[in-house]
Curated annotation (Swiss-Prot):
[4Fe-4S] cluster 2 binds at residues 74, 104, 107, 110. Its main location: membrane. Binds 2 [4Fe-4S] clusters per subunit. Residues 175-200 are annotated as: Disordered. Pfam families: Fer4_7. Residues 55-84, 95-124 form the 4Fe-4S ferredoxin-type domain. It catalyses: a plastoquinone + NADH + (n+1) H(+)(in) = a plastoquinol + NAD(+) + n H(+)(out); a plastoquinone + NADPH + (n+1) H(+)(in) = a plastoquinol + NADP(+) + n H(+)(out). This is NAD(P)H-quinone oxidoreductase subunit I. The lineage of its organism: Bacteria, Bacillati, Cyanobacteriota, Cyanophyceae, Acaryochloridales.
Length: 200
C-alpha cells in the first residue's frame, strides 16, 4: 500500500512539474505574440538601405582614365582593368573593366580613392544568381542605372532597420500598432522644403 501511495505522489509531482514547464513555454509564446513583427515580407516589402550602404558598384566608362588606382587599393586586387596605350594622343585608353561581385568584399576602397569618381556605390544588394560566373560584371553590366527600392512601384518600402519608436529600449511594452521610428519616403518628400523660384 505504501509503495502504491509513493508512486501516486511521485506521478502527481511529475505531472505538476510538466504542467508548469508547459505553462512557462506558453507564457514565452504569448509574450512574443504581443510584439511587433521583425520579419519583412520579401520580395513584396524591402528595407530601405541606410544612407552609407555599400551595395553594387556603379561604373562610368567615359570617366575612367585607366590609372589602376582601384586595383592597387583593393585588398584582394579584384578589379580587372584592360587598356591599351594610344600613341596618337599619348594616353591610356580603356578597353574593358570588370569586377567579380562573387569575390568582392564591398569595402568601397576603389570608390573612395578613384581620382575621377567613375566608381560609386549603389543600394543594390540583390546579386544572387544560379551561376557564380554571372556575378562577374563587365563595364556594360556595371554601367546600368542603379536600382532604388523607393522607386519600385511593385514593392512596399519599409521605413528603416530600427523597429522601435524613438527613446524606447524595450519592445515588450510597445503596442504592435504603434508607428515605427523614422519616416516613410512620402513623409521625407513632404517635409523637404521646396526650392524657391525667383520671380521677375
Amino acid at each position: 500500500m505504501l509503495k502504491f501511495l509513493n508512486q501516486v505522489t511521485s506521478y502527481g509531482k511529475e505531472s505538476f512539474q510538466a504542467a508548469r514547464y508547459i505553462g512557462q513555454g506558453l507564457a514565452v509564446t504569448f509574450d512574443h505574440m504581443k510584439r511587433r513583427p521583425i520579419t519583412v515580407q520579401y520580395p513584396y516589402e524591402k528595407l530601405i538601405p541606410s544612407e552609407r550602404f555599400r551595395g553594387r558598384i556603379h561604373f562610368e566608362f567615359d570617366k575612367c582614365i585607366s590609372c589602376e588606382v582601384c586595383v592597387r587599393v583593393c585588398p584582394i586586387n579584384l578589379p580587372v582593368v584592360d587598356w591599351e596605350f594610344n600613341k596618337e594622343i599619348k594616353k591610356k585608353q580603356l578597353k574593358h573593366y570588370s569586377i567579380d561581385f562573387g569575390v568582392c568584399i564591398f569595402c568601397a576602397n576603389c570608390v573612395e580613392y578613384c581620382p575621377t569618381n567613375c566608381l560609386s556605390v549603389t543600394e543594390e544588394y540583390e546579386l544572387s544568381t544560379f551561376d557564380r560566373h554571372e556575378l562577374n560584371f563587365d563595364n556594360v553590366a556595371m554601367g546600368r542605372l542603379p536600382y532604388k527600392v523607393t522607386q519600385d512601384p511593385m514593392v512596399t518600402p519599409i521605413r528603416e532597420f530600427a523597429y522601435l519608436p524613438e527613446s524606447e529600449m524595450d519592445g515588450h511594452n510597445v503596442d504592435h500598432t504603434a508607428p515605427r521610428a523614422g519616416q516613410t519616403p512620402a513623409e521625407i518628400v513632404a517635409s523637404t522644403p521646396k526650392p524657391e523660384t525667383k520671380e521677375g
